[in-house]
Structure formats: C-alpha cells, structure tokens
Amino acid sequence: MIEIRNISQRFAGPRGSVEALHNVNLSIPAGEVFGIIGRSGAGKSTLVRTINLLTRPSEGNIVVNGRDLTTLPAAQLREARREIGMIFQHFNLLSSRTVYGNVALPLELAGMKRDEIEANVLPLLELVGLTAQKDRYPAQISGGQKQRVGIARALASKPKVLLSDEATSALDPETTRSILDLLRRINRELNLTIVLITHQMDVIKQVCDRVAVLDAGRVVEEGKVIDVFLQPHHEVTRALIGDVIAQELPPAMKARVAERLKTGSGHLLRLAFTGSGVDQPILSETIRRYELDFNILHGQIDEIQGQAFGSLAVLAGGEPAKVAQALTYLREQGVVVEELSYVE
C-alpha cells in the first residue's frame, strides 16, 4: 500500500543545510493503522507530509497503491492525492460554513452535483456521529466535534489512505479516546490505511497495529506495538513508553537496590508477560521450584489492542546457579526477561 523508500529531506538553514530526514525506509500494508512517534523535532510531521508530497523529499521515492508519487506529472499527482485524506492538530474549518458545508466543500470544489454531495455527506456525518449537529457552525460545537468534522471532510473523497498529524494532541484525554475509537472503527469498516503521527505512546497503544520510532530524522526502532512495548531496544523508545509501562524504579527504592547490587546479594530483573502468561502463576511457581526470594519492586497490567500485558521489576535473591536456572525457566514460559546490572 505505502512504500517509503530511502527518503531524505534537507532544508536550508541560517548555518547551512539541515537534514530533517535521513534515509527513511518503511512499508505499510493496506488496512493497517501505522503509528510514527518521536520527540519534538524528530521529523514526524515532515515524514507524513512526504507521503502525499505536501513536502517533496530531497531524495527517495514514495509509492502509494503501486504508483510512485515522486515521478508523477502535476495532473496525475492531483488525482493520486484524492486517494489520500489528511487531518491535522488544528481543525482548519471555515467558520462561515456549517458542519455539513465544511464536509461538502471538497466535493463542491470537485464539481459534484448537489444531490450527489448530499448522498455522500449525510452518511459521513452519521459515521462520525454528527448528524444532529449538521446545521451548526464551528463556533457552536466542541473541539472533539470539530475534529470529527475534519475526519468526515478528509473521508469525503473516499480515500484509501488517511494521514493523521497530531490530530488528538489538542484534545482532552476523554475526547482523545473517543476520536481514536472512531479512527479504529473507520479503519475496520472502510478497510482504510491510517498513518498516525503522535508524540504520545498512549495513543499508539490504543489504536496502532505497528509503530516506528523516529529520532533526529532516522527510524531507530520499528515493530508490532506489543513487541515494542514489552521489549524496547532504543533509549528513545524507552523514554517514550516510560509513562505507559513503568521503566524506572521509584526513587525511594533506588538507593537500597543499588546497595544490594554492589554487594552481589541480589539480581535486578525486568519481567514482561503477555497473553495467557499475565494471569498464570508463573512467578510463584518459579519461586517454589528454584527456592528463590523475589522482592517485587513495582508492576502493572495493561492492554494493547485487546491483548493483556504485564510488567514487573523484581529483585531476585538466591544461589547464582538457581537464579540462572530460574531465568531459563521463565524464558521457556514466554516471559521476556531483562537482567539489569544497574539501577536506572
């Protein structure tokens, strides 16, 4: 569906050329919700704007539905862009037009007849839950409703791809959840491919199938959301998921744990469980089988796309040989085990 091939983007700066993207390669299958996350300035918005060539890359190719957009002449590019909708952090609604009028605008500009416009707009308003608000003006509806108008407007041309650039970052948590639920429902009902840009890992957790982590214009990690959450490899990924899965020990415990690590009287472990392992007595069975002491420092259980996962930080005490055997056993049970030689 979407192939991002060797994309680099450079801009002129006061001190010379600035590279916003460096050799980015991503493949996004049809019907997937794909998240791109990173800190401010990582290049997220620049990358998503290359997908519909709002920003033309300095190098590389963008292939959507088998067509290389970077090689298309202007008329064919305009046609191809009709298959790519986009929503933004700022709603960009026309204050002089009603909800209905804002959604109808791109169809009017395309020269569609009035009865055809109505036949397209009314189902979209029903889809996004705004049928009752169709005659209201932007000033008369909430921020979440404005974003729903933006989504309906982006879907008016019946695109195959929807790009979302920080579309929920200006919304409160409850409204954010409702918008993400709507995007997921649209993805399933319309088989719409969605590329979602955000700086919030909780957004990725709620709605995305896979995720790419961007840092300084480079993809530093990519994979299924559940895998990235349970076993983050890059330090940027660890920092981004810190508010979703507790990665750090509470400050009050750090000194005590550090002292035990110095004396060799304990092993600091991070354990991650998923699927059926979340509600199985794996830890208690390990303690009994290998005669270990496990001090649970912190833990939590959450859910990603209907799949339960859990994370524990434990300080294990016991004979080194038995600790090693216990870690092997845990891994055999499907537990992700990370041995830490220091206190973060």
UniProtKB/Swiss-Prot annotation:
It catalyses: L-methionine(out) + ATP + H2O = L-methionine(in) + ADP + phosphate + H(+); D-methionine(out) + ATP + H2O = D-methionine(in) + ADP + phosphate + H(+). Its EC number is 7.4.2.11. It is a peripheral membrane protein. ATP binds at residues 38-45. It is found in: Cell inner membrane. Pfam families: ABC_tran (PF00005), NIL (PF09383). One of its GO terms (cellular component) is plasma membrane. It comes from the Bacteria. CDD domains: ABC_MetN_methionine_transporter. Keywords: Amino-acid transport, ATP-binding, Cell inner membrane, Cell membrane, Membrane, Nucleotide-binding, Translocase, Transport. One of its GO terms (molecular function) is ATP hydrolysis activity. SMART domains: AAA, NIL. Residues 2-241 form the ABC transporter domain. Part of the ABC transporter complex MetNIQ involved in methionine import. Responsible for energy coupling to the transport system. The complex is composed of two ATP-binding proteins (MetN), two transmembrane proteins (MetI) and a solute-binding protein (MetQ). Belongs to the ABC transporter superfamily. Methionine importer (TC 3.A.1.24) family. This is Methionine import ATP-binding protein MetN 1. It comes from Paraburkholderia xenovorans (strain LB400). The gene is metN1.
